[in-house]
Amino acid sequence: MVKVIFLFRFRADRDAEDVRTWWLNEHSVIALKNLGMLRYVQNHFIGAIDAEHAGAGMGYDGCVEVWFEDRAAYEQTMASPEWKALEDDGPNGLDMTSLMGGFVMGHVMRWDAAPDGRPSTTTDRAQIA
């Protein structure tokens, strides 16, 4: 399994909520046409956890997790017209100069899940059983 994460800021000349709506309802439709992606997760940053973690503001407005079967599937997707369409749509809401992407290796340290795969807590599990 190959996982890629992209981090980015929204365009400064657009309202952040409008960009979130575009990203969720329009950009995602284009993204999902890339059939080589096994998983596509949008993470919309909505604010710092607390004042201590706010620093000089949020460094990014969002990130995307994209999962592929293997490196060949990743390469094939990157070379596809569907990915080109996704790249062409990016500047409609994203500050492309802020875009960072990279391969990541996740290490799941805890994933309590319900029988159907939904994340849950121990308390939730007692209610499901």
Feature locations, PLM:
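Macromolecular interaction modules
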Residues: M1-A129
